[in-house]
Amino acid sequence: VQITLDGMKKTHNEVKHLASGEDVFERVISNIELLNDLAPEINVTIRVNLTLKNKHEYAELYKFCQNRFGERRNIGLTPAFVLDRSISNCDVCIENGILFTHENRSKFILDLAHKGFDSPFIRYPEPFFNECAVRNDMAIAFDPEGYTYKCWEVIGNKEYAIGKLDKDGILANINEKILNRQLYGADTFEDPVCSKCKYLPICNGGCPIQRIQNKFEKAHNDCCTPYKGFTPDFLKIHIARKKALEVAATEKQQ
């Protein structure tokens, strides 16, 4: 289960708020605890939406969750970088310091690692490879109106809807063009540039929905892995951590 936060309490409640004025941040945290109490076997990933304006809150939120959730198992945090996903790739947002670029995203991940914060991005190399839910025929997401999507980042944009639930809860009015485009239209190995790139398959092909926008909607998304251009830095951290684990294991045996 993936649950989203937009920063610490003040920031989150400014982004997501109720007319009643209820503390939405505390409601989310309490619901995570409730879910963990009722079904501790379910893995909960707290996805923290980050821009250049709130990136400094990630470390604080990480420590907050460590203290709040204590010894609870199967609850983890991961940064989710807000990139420009518009077709026009609005330069104003980048110039105003709102959105992450490839370079400052990679540097932020490395900075977290140097400060001792773990993240899925720093676990290099991955023990296995997998693809995004967009290309998984069993994955699906819904909006409040019953429209269905393959990608949770475009929920609410009906141009990407593959169908809609009818009154009986059955998926109907399937848009086969959109469905097939999202399932098969982002094959990395059909991209002449990517298929020759040395970072494939480490990158897993990048974000499929971005690739689809580039291919069919004339967007200019940067789909490359955070490792690109920074592989030596990631490897140094990986090697240092591996050595530290080996030393700790040796000391434990003595």
Task: State each model region's role.
Residues 158-254:
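Flexible mid-to-C-terminal extensions adjoining Fe-S/redox cofactors in radical SAM and related proteins
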Residues 5, 51-54, 200:
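Short beta->alpha junction loops/turns
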Residues 10-137, 141-145, 160-164:
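Radical SAM enzyme [4Fe-4S]-AdoMet core and its adjacent flexible, acidic
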